Amino acid sequence: GGGIIKSNNTLYEEEIGSITGMVLELGPDCYADKKRFPSGPFCKKGDWILMRSYSGTRFKVHGKEFRLINDDSVEAVVEDPRGIAKL
């Protein structure tokens, strides 16, 4: 039988590849490109989303991490982030 062998580095990168976050605010130009987002906004304020771990600009305010990400960095909207498991 055939198969794919992945290096430890590849496995590690896949493991840390996605994280969840809550949408705190949407900027005025978010999802404004009708060609890329013909159905309108993909997510809304208060949604839990899945994004790549390297997405956006990371910063801390009073010890809490925040990120500024582009609208096209949202991979999915998830109901409950506690149910998300990394493979």
Segments (PLM) and residue ranges:
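Compact, glycine-rich, soluble single-domain proteins
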Residues: 1-87
